[in-house]
């Protein structure tokens, strides 16, 4: 196995504990937690560093990690596809310490850094970092500036500067080792946090300005970008509070997210014609911005793009724009008029929230939806035209507007052709008949209307919002008309007396928790054409006795029938290409992953299944015994949790992993055989199994996790094999009758609370 190797600057060193080996590439796994401490070279005093940045040589990974007062840091690897590098910078962004390249594993490291003094004090002219596959990266110091050199293309990227005060002149070309290199870009973080920088001369030939390159340069007051620049990176000028003007050339085709975020002195911006998208947060919190020109080339405006631009009094959105994302203009308190162009289909959540100066809004006929809080707090709007095309309006879309506040009458309120909300207390035994031509029912429209017993929905309705009938506890039946394609999140949740519902053939999606707690439902006919059933869509529908999944269903969220304890029959149409119920097994099997997704009290697990999925049998109150066939290797999280009448489980030798809470609260489970091949038992796996009296820990297990046997009151004896090296907190907590614990080995770490409230335990 080949070790990672690097050639690193002589001006800095990375030291690890002598007992730790140099890590190899295969040890760099996503999710690995890296921890360490930063110290100054030749001094044991810890340093408080502003941040440690994790990134690869292509800068595709970035995370900011603050150290504590003792210089300790910790972060989790998100990508391990490249050599990882760590930058340590001082609190004000100046390069107090130079670049450190290193490989990381789970070991604890000390990073020892030499102060970076620049070229004059440092005789080393270059540094090289070599990737595992042989690619070499050359850094060179020339006239107080540091560059990433590309010998093949004869180009150089400005990486940092030893003097970041006053005006900095970036050369068009540098000479290094008697060869000329064209400076073609400013690298990520080049002038990061240089508060003393007041000006910068950027020559022609520069094509890119990197991510955070001038981040926090609060003294920078104006920037002229030359022709030829194509990209401005993410947060390139973020926090440049003194920046009054920036000239963006027509050659720019891309400006990254948050590019000018917080440039509070910036008064105007002209976006060049080549830009097609204004990225999220591009001008957010530019509180002095009064004028913006958006060209016809722009087709989308990202979330928060102009949020908090309090001085922006007018903005022309060109007809080319098709998408405006949520909160794009939130808090633009000086904005007076807005025209939503033809082609935009949705006014998204919070788009104009808090625009208190807004008095006139023109919405085009292409708009079909208005999101939650879209005009919330727009107190100046006294009238607004809602086109007939709108069939979906989110909660509090017009909250606080003068126009909406004028609607004082109790009863059903329509906004345009949308049944928006029921005001006041609904009388008992109310039947609502929606008027012909109604196109939608808004989010939360009838939520908590306990008096509603029935509703007639016309065929013109095409959309029913999330939570629309949630907690209508006396609603007994409903027919959804053809044309509706989605039952939204929590649409009928806690409709406890809903016993009959007719779903249309047009339905393609049932979202998460759509029928949560509809305990009176005994059957639901899922129409052919339905493609998706969301997470816990039928949670605690205890009256359901059967489930029939049509051939069209291709996606299911986690535990769609969680807590449906009355289900006795499960059938999947034979034409389904994703799910199956082979040999009348009364279960839903994902055929690609060979995972049992949902089971019931009559399930017979078929051969070929390799995993019992998360929550597959959770709260299955009528399940008394289950035999798991050979070939199953994993019991998922909460797989049999809360099966309170489960008495017998047969596990095959093939099982290697038992997930968190897999058998938690199985109160009747008196014994279970755990194969010796099991190497992982998750937290709380057997918590609350009160009837278990003895348990044999498998020889392959190394750790007994937290809460594994919490509250196993009947447990009297436990044998810990010598393979177990640690026992977590509360692993045997509240095992009040535990009288005998036999340890086969001595080298074991026991957490302080592992046996808390076990009066019979002594070690």
Where are the language model's segments positioned?
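Beta-strand-rich domain onsets/edges
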Residues: 19-33, 39-40
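Extracellular beta-sheet/turn segments enriched in Thr/Pro/Gly and aliphatic residues
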Residues: 21-27, 100-127
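Short, ordered, surface-exposed loop/turn motifs in non-cytosolic proteins
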Residues: 32-34, 41-57
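Short, acidic Ser/Thr/Gly-rich low-complexity loop/linker segments typical of extracellular
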Residues: 58-72
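A short, solvent-exposed loop/turn motif at the edges and junctions
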Residues: 60, 85-105, 117
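Short, surface-exposed beta-strand/beta-hairpin micro-motifs centered on an aromatic residue
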Residues: 68-77, 189
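Consensus positions within tandem repeat domains that build extended binding/scaffold surfaces
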Residues: 188-189, 210-215, 233-238, 256-259, ...
């Amino acid at each position: 196995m080949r070790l990672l190797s690097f050639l690193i600057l002589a001006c800095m060193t990375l030291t690890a504990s002598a007992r730790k080996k140099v890590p190899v590439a295969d040890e760099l796994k996503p999710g690995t937690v890296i921890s360490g401490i930063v110290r100054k070279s030749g001094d044991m005093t810890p340093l408080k560093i502003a941040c440690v940045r994790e990134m690869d040589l292509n800068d595709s990974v970035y995370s900011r990690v603050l150290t504590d007062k003792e210089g300790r840091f910790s972060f989790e690897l998100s990508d391990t596809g490249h050599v990882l590098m760590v930058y340590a910078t001082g609190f004000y962004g100046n390069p107090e310490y130079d670049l450190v390249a290193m490989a990381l594993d789970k070991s604890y490291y000390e990073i020892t850094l030499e102060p970076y003094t620049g070229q004059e004090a440092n005789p080393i002219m270059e540094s090289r970092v070599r990737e595992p596959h042989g690619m070499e990266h050359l850094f060179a110091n020339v006239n107080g500036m540091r560059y990433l050199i590309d010998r093949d293309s004869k180009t150089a990227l400005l990486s940092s500067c030893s003097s970041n005060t006053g005006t900095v002149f970036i050369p068009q070309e540098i000479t290094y080792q008697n060869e000329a290199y064209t400076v073609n870009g400013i690298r990520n973080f080049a002038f990061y946090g240089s508060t003393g920088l007041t000006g910068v001369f950027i020559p022609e030939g520069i094509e890119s300005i990197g991510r955070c390159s001038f981040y926090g340069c609060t003294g920078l007051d104006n920037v002229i970008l030359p022709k030829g620049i194509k990209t401005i990176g993410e947060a390139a000028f973020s926090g440049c509070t003194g920046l009054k003007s920036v000239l963006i050339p027509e050659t720019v085709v891309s400006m990254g997210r948050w590019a000018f975020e917080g440039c509070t002195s910036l008064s105007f911006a002209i976006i060049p014609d080549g830009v097609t998208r204004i990225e999220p947060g591009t001008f957010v919190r530019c509180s002095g911005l009064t004028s913006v020109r958006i060209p016809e080339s722009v087709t989308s405006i990202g979330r928060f793009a102009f949020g908090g631009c309090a001085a922006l009094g007018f903005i022309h959105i060109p007809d080319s724009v098709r998408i405006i994302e949520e909160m794009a203009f939130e808090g633009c308190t000086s904005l007076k008029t807005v025209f939503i162009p033809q082609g935009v289909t949705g006014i998204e959540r919070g788009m104009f929230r808090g625009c208190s100066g807004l008095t006139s809004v023109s919405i085009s006929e292409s708009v079909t939806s208005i999101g939650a809080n879209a005009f919330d707090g727009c107190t100046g709007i006294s009238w607004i035209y809602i086109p007939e095309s709108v069939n979906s309006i989110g909660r509090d879309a017009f909250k606080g507007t003068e126009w909406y506040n004028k609607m004082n009458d109790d009863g059903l309120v329509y906004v345009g052709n949308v049944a928006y909300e029921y005001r006041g207390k609904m009388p008992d035994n109310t039947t609502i008949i929606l008027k012909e031509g109604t196109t939608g029912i808004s989010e939360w429209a009838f939520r908590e209307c306990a008096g509603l017993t029935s509703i007639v929905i016309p065929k013109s309705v095409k959309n029913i919002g999330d939570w629309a009938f949630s907690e209508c506890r006396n609603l007994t039946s409903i027919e959804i008309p053809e044309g509706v394609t989605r039952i939204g999140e929590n649409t009928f949740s806690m409709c406890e007396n809903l016993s009959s519902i007719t779903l249309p053939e047009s339905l393609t999606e049932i979202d998460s928790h759509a029928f949560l707690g509809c305990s009176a439902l005994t059957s639901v006919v899922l129409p052919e054409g339905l493609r998706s059933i969301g997470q816990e869509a039928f949670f605690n529908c205890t009256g359901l006795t059967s489930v029939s999944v049509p051939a069209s269903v291709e996606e299911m969220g986690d535990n769609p029938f969680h807590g449906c304890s009355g289900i006795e029959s499960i059938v999947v149409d034979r034409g389904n290409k994703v799910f199956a119920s082979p040999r009348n097994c009364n279960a839903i099997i994902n055929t690609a992953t060979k995972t049992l997704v949902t089971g019931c009290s009559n399930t017979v697990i078929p051969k070929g299944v390799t995993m019992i999925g998360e929550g597959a049998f959770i709260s299955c109150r009528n399940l008394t015994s289950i035999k798991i066939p050979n070939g199953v290797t994993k019991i998922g999280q909460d797989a049999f949790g809360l099966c309170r009448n489960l008495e017998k489980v047969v596990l095959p030798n093939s099982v290697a992993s038992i997930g968190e809470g897999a058998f938690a609260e199985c109160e009747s489970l008196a014994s279970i055989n755990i194969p010796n091949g099991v190497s992982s038992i998750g937290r709380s796996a057997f918590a609350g199994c009160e009837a278990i009296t003895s348990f044999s820990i498998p020889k392959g297990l190394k750790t007994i996790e937290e809460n594994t046997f919490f509250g196993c009151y009947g447990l009297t004896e436990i044998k810990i094999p010598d393979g177990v090296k640690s026992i977590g907190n509360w692993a045997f907590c509240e095992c009040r009758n535990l009288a005998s614990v036999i340890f086969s080995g001595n080298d074991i770490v026991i957490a302080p609370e592992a046996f808390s409230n076990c009066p019979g335990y002594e070690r």
